[in-house]
Amino acid sequence: MKSIKIGIALCLTVAMGSPALTSEKAAFKISNKSSARTKQSTTIPKSPQQDSVVLQDDKDSLVQVAFKRVNKADLLGGVSVVNVSRLMEKNYATYSLENLEALAPGFHGNIWGNSSYLVLVDGFPRDANNVLPTEIDQITVMKGIGAVALYGSRAAKGVVYITTKRGGSYAQKVNVRANAGINTPKAYPEYLGSAEYMTLYNEARRNDGLTDLYSTAAIYNHASGSNPFRYPNIDFYSSEYLSDSYNRYDLTTEISGGNETARYYTNIGYWSNGSLLNFGEAAGNNRSNRFNLRGNIDVKLNRVIKLNVDASASFYTGKGVNTDYWGNSATVRPNRFSPLIPISMLENGDDPSQIYVNNSNYVIDGKYLLGGTQLDQTNVFASIYAGGSNKNINRQFQFNTGVDFDLSGLLQGLAFKSTLAIDYLTSFTQAYNNNYAVYEAGWNNYAGYDQISGLTKYGDDSKTGAENISSSYYRQNIAFSGQFNYNRTFGKNHNVSGTLLGYGFHIGESEVYHKTNNANLGLQLAYNFAQKYYADFSSAYIYSAKLPEGNRAAFSPTLSIGWRISEENFLKDVSAIDNLKITASAGILNTDLDISTYYLYQGYYTYNNAAWYSWKDGQLVHSFDRRRGNNFDMTFPQRREINFGIEGSLLNDFIGFSGNAFFSQTKGNIVQPTSLYPIYLSTGWPVYSDIPYVNYDNDQRRGFDFSLNFNKQLGKVGWTLGFNGTYYQTEASSRASDSQYEYDYQRRTGRPLDAIFGLRSDGFFMDETDIANSPDQSTLASGGVKPGDIKYKDQNSDGIVDTRDEVYLGRGGWSGAPLTLGVNLTAKWKNLTFFALGTGRFGAKAMKNTNSYGNYFWVDGQDKYSEVVRGRWTEETKDVATFPRLTTGTSDNNYRDSDFWLFSTDRFDLAKVQVSYQFPARMLGKGFIKEFGAYVNGFNLLTIAKERDILELNVGSAPQTRFYNLGVKALF
């Protein structure tokens, strides 16, 4: 406890700017083996091939892996690493994992085809979005089974380990960075104006055998725009409501330094981000901001004990209004109502209406009352003008400490380390919720011009002044580890290491009864001979309360080997080869990640959610219904994997490369396989099931990743070019659900895990004769099909098109695109640096359905019409139509998953371009500014894709943006 108090006091001293810990000594450097390997020496070169062009100096030689840091030359594959602190010198970023898929092979939004990953910050489970790039030293992506084994069950799908910055043994440094930029929208949805909507809605009614709803005169008046208050034409994306752009700015100060006894680091940051909304209360409540403070200190108490204390706090406030503007923009039709009622157009002598004006709390700009109708008594515009505002508050505090004991006095090479972390997060919404009245105008033009003859009022104005608290959320993380480490070299060449550890964490959340837990023991034994031959055994003994007693613990072993063949006699004298190493790993990792909840092994009865029954009319009673059977033999699902790796450098580090191939199986996923049991064990009504959850479904994943880097000085320009890529395939190798399918093409076994199934379209029905001569589709449409509806292929030739005719259409890329590519280019001339980064995603498809695009593409009933309906089917356009006929009913036949709505998500994005200039030292003189630089950059500048218009489209949410930024940085 005394040590913790000392550490906290030292952190506070640093934050207050005390120079007591400064040192005039030169900057501390981690020693590394020479990069210029001679053929007479067995020293191993630096490895720029380790997956990122930014890993090219000696400081980067140590890589954070599970519970330790190792020389990157000694990595055994399945690990990618990015030096964020060095990358930020030429690539300013705003998010911790920004463009990571273009820098770390194997990462494609997830890792090696899996659906999630564990994020660790300094070894503890934390949110990636709560640590900024300016705070990060290094990001390690642990992909292979051997790399993640020590973390146990929760790491079975991979680990992204974020290492934050720390101080060093050097005189105090103060780094300041400031940025300011603007965001501009890429694209907005395009909806029809009032007149066009009304015209096409009339057409939809005629298609349904109904009469027109809107008269020709009404359509003309809406089209003319002569009186937008009487004949509204709402455009949510006009400059009346939105700005052309919004700004973002940030400021970061870093203070670091220390000596051989104590080292410290402090990061103080602030950012603020705006919004496009620019009217009503949104104009003053459209910003979010965040203040953060991070500090750590490393203290060498004596020759045996070292201590570290880390703490961070963040304070986020997001201001907004009490409505969903973007959601309403996708649903509110343009002619529905007028947002504002002009007071100037009130008829003279209309005293009742004038009383409304005089008594209103909300006269907008002194000229307007809030508009609405009986059906729109609360609406998005009135809510923004008068409904009040809110603040979303998020506060996080994170604390961790660790102590290291050098036990070489007991046994040479022995050490002990223990860590403890306690994190708190709380969030809630503070809101002022106001009530307001809206008014519907009654119009006349008997005077020869439009005027309001009367107002109908709906609702009342009221302000309580009370601040309402809602959406409260609380989370607590507690993590602990303790480990014995052994590291010793025998006879100069025999390097032996081992780790015995205990590791665990639990995450408690508000309104969640069971905490998220991870607990395991770990054992690692490693050996390498002269950095030529490697062997590593990593294992975990895990525990999970989600399994039945007797099956809650399991052993997860892995084995990795490596061979640096460039040190063998047959390659040692090949001057073109600087370094060449091959690796292999295999293992079994037990996991409870995909066990959705607790007690699945235990059957249960339900009462509250059961069916009703009664022996007497008017008196209903719940039954007791069984929902699942017992399975006390349930075991852990397992990740079984073998992977192979290669890495090397050629031609004196002109070329660096790495690659991994992986073959992984997830065996024993837990499902309730209704179709595998007799039908009498389950019923649909009342809902009853005696079928247990069992280990049955199996998945497969296989693929490869690679990196290829080139470094060359051409004249006065230093060039670095890097390519990264990840390709993976998935397969449902066993599915209990397949027994419900009648035909082979329906079955999920053998298909990708992200398989999209749907019908195959065959154009449109051209007329009634075409319908009569085609397979029956009446089961797809409750009212039957009509000319202009989509025609589908009858896959099983039974004369009926139904869900049994759905086939495999493509991969959804839900865990990341099947093929992810990244390219980065750096050119440095004197003090000027150019950097560009691009990402490519290929091989996936998506549906233009309501899940992604609301009713933008699937338009029927009372939906708002988008520009896609201009290609609708009519008798005149039947040969060139690109969209089904319009209807005011429910278009069950047309709006279902089929290849008609399928599109490719293949794309290449120019994600970043930055030009940086470092001012020469002679320009700065001998003042207090030691270094000064400036840069300009652009984010998300260009997308090249066949379906770019769709890929850049957001429906029902704020638009995607491009960001242009100017930044400066200085060292004091």
Regions from the PLM with identified roles:
Residues 1-294, 306-308, 719, 740, ...:
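Short, small/polar-rich motifs associated with maturation and membrane association
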Residues 9, 296-305, 311-315, 350-356, ...:
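Extracellular/periplasmic, surface-exposed regions of secreted and cell-surface proteins
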Residues 119, 527, 795, 827:
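Short aromatic-centered micro-motifs
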Residues 124-167, 187-191, 232-252, 271-310, ...:
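Outer-membrane beta-barrel proteins
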Residues 175-230, 323-324, 328-332, 598, ...:
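Conserved small-residue
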Residues 378, 382, 787, 841-934, ...:
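Extracytoplasmic gating/loop element in the C-terminal half of outer-membrane beta-barrel translocons
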Residues 690-700, 740-757, 809-822, 826, ...:
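C-terminal extracellular loops and terminal segments
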Residues 814-847:
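Glycine-rich, aromatic-lined ligand/substrate-binding cores of catalytic
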